[in-house]
Each structure stands twice: as C-alpha cells, then as structure tokens.
C-alpha cells in the first residue's frame, strides 16, 4: 500500500508545530495555567463556573415555575367554584354499589333535576348485568 506524499504527517522544517506555539504562549507541557493579574481565567475554570451558574439558574427557574403553577392552580379552582356557584348547579359524587363504579352527577341546585351523569344510567345497567353474569358463570375474571 502506497501512501502519497501529501498525506504525510511530517511537517516541513521551520514551521511551528503545536508544542512550539504552546511554549511561546507560556503554557508549556506540565506547567499549570494560572489566572493573570488582569483577571483572565483559564477556559476550564470559566466553563465550570458557567455550568454552575446555568444549573443554579435552572433550579431557580424551576422553583419559580412551581410557585406559579401552585398559584395558578389555586386561582383556577377559585374561578371554577365561582363559576359553578354562579350558574346554580350542583355536583354529586357517589359509588354505584352493584357495579362498583364511581358516578358523578351534575344537577340543578334549586330543583334537584339531573342535568348530566357520568357514566350514563344505561351504561351502569350494562355494567350491573355484566357483574351479575360474570359472578355466576365465571367466564370473565377480573384481575387488578
């Protein structure tokens, strides 16, 4: 295998290589770099402090977001309560005993008429029948 001359790693005589450039700058091999009296900091130290500042800023931002989120949630709950009370509607929560499902009912506060129920009564009837048949037949086994 031939290596062409222009791919050689040998540098011509008299050109400065990396070691000579480092020595001219005063940062030779084995000598630690220190900050000068003008306040220059080595790139590694600057990078470390820059990283610390960014981490600290991210933590502070996350804490402020949590405070805002908590305040926003409290405000939203307050607004929802005001809205529900202003439209004279009520909300009831119960557990259907036969099907074992949670039921939410929205009703008119003054008259007690049911406006909406989740899940619907028809679905509750189906769930009750399913529970009754599966208990007797053993076809479906409920696993949690």
Swiss-Prot record:
Disulfide bonds: none annotated. Transmembrane segments: none annotated. It comes from the Bacteria. InterPro entries: FlaG, FlaG-like_sf. Residues 11-41 have a biased composition (Polar residues). Residues 11-51 are annotated as: Disordered. To FlaG in other Vibrio species. PANTHER family: PROTEIN FLAG (PTHR37166:SF1). This is Protein FlaG. It comes from Vibrio parahaemolyticus serotype O3:K6 (strain RIMD 2210633).
